């Protein structure tokens, strides 16, 4: 279902207007026919490049479908509707037999309460780049919802997805990881790794270069979703590094492409 008109826009390389509209798909189903049966709710509200955005918009939508739904050869609206139906069908098929065994135990009802939500928007992050920002929140019987920010970076000039290999030289992690650790320490106002651990960071994992980041005009914002490098209570962690800080392992061609 088409939900809202133009969301945002920017110029493409041919002087055209790259515009987005909001699409919505959703459904709620009860696990059984009982009035107080556990519920599964799916809600997808997603930015979609319009037809007026041409081939560039088509490439962006196709990449979003692949990244978020692992599908190819289907439009975004169709992928959304298909995902909603499959998620709800899978919920009933897999959870109903288990629920029937636990039906008499009301303390276990929450184990069967499911929800899956995606909200997305777009942001022009430099003259030639766009970030597609998908926020995913889901719970499959957990006490706490799982929350994720999943950015997808694009060139507005071509619609191409920006990959790690477009930005960084080979072996960049060995130089980036120490910078990320240093920035995290500065953010938390500590001087040692032990002090970071005392604050709930890096207790079970070493610092690493995350797959999630937002390409900006002068910076990259690296994103760690809840529980990735810190306790759940810390929430989403963002570390911002400038291109000047990363100049030893950033490809010059990438920096030029931002101009």
Question: Across the structure, where does each feature detected by a protein language model lie?
Answer:
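Sec-dependent bacterial lipoprotein signal peptides
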Residues: 1-8
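Compositionally biased intrinsically disordered regions enriched in Thr/Gly
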Residues: 10-259
